Amino acid sequence: MLFLHTLQHFTVDGICGAVLAAYAVNESYFEPIAYYFGLYNLIAFGSQWLIGYLLDRKFNLIGHAFLVSLITLALGTISELGILCQTILLGIGNSLFHVAGGSLVLRKYKTYKELGIFVSSGAIGLALGLNLLCNAIVFLLFYAAITLIVFYRLRRGHVDIEVQSESRDNKYVGFPLIAMLGCIILLLGCVVLRGFGGGNSVSDYVMLFPCVFAAGKVLGGICCDKIGYKNTIILIFLLSFLSLQWKGLIPIVILTLAFNMTMPLTLRLVHFCNPNYPGMMFGLAAGCLLPGAFFHNDFSVIPQAMVVIQFLTLFIAGWLFKTYNQRQVVL
């Protein structure tokens, strides 16, 4: 199922990127392009926490969420509906898929590498779509076929998913509420920083950097499993620090790789802080990428400072989690 969800992620982002790019190349003015891209990001990323919360409460609907995602994305490819309607449909379909897929991966696997693999493919699909290297209909046909397989397997019970019951008392033995909230805030703060520093590519390398984004996410998950998340935090800092010591394409690639290595780490630790709501926590992390999408040109922090701030947020969050992770959720 991980392979299927990863392919779904690739095709979903490809659909959205291709449709929006097809509109942009025929639009003469920049303002409407910026508006509709911004609206898409707002819906696709800003609604995930709410959809995640609803699916956490009604887990039996998660298979249907994939179908609704397929329908809305298919409708979003119809240009006759108008770009406003298309943008809304694409945002909803994208949000539904990400939350449903992310929730399943968080529930089924307890390690980091699966998360890294799942989130890695979207950047490549998005780049192919935005650069019109693949048609939206091609992406859609693949997404439809894969989604029907996923829905069938979920309905037939072929997927072993651990469904945790909600803690009615919200009591965390050995993990004080203030420590949990502090850990979540710090981890989400790191995601905000990644939105500003880990997703921008050089236009001359339209496919190189999306592949680096993907490689960083996979590598981050593997490192967390092999050497632990604490050592991975240090490794990310060292890679980032070393990349700032000289100029050129290679240092930029290394820095981009390091920033993206944080993604599976933050997603998993945020989920561990509130394991009863994987969909909502996944959505909260996704929503924290919005500031980078909207205010990147207005936000100026020297790379050295950003690297240090990222390291401090991860280090303190990791310390809080290590100190208080001897907790037991009262189910």
Model-derived segments and their meaning:
Residues 1-41, 186-201, 297:
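Helix-loop boundary and gating motifs at the non-cytosolic
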Residues 16-21, 171-217:
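Extracytoplasmic gate region of multi-pass secondary transporters
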Residues 34-56, 208-219:
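Central cavity-lining transmembrane alpha-helices of secondary-active solute carriers
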Residues 62-78, 231-246:
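Structural signature of the two symmetry-related core transmembrane helices
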Residues 95-110, 260-275:
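Intracellular juxtamembrane helix-capping segments at the cytosolic ends
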Residues 137-156, 304-324:
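Symmetry-related core transmembrane helices of the 12-TM Major Facilitator Superfamily/SLC fold
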Residues 230-266:
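C-terminal transmembrane helical hairpin of 12-TM major facilitator-type secondary transporters
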Residues 275-310:
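A late C-terminal transmembrane helix in Major Facilitator Superfamily
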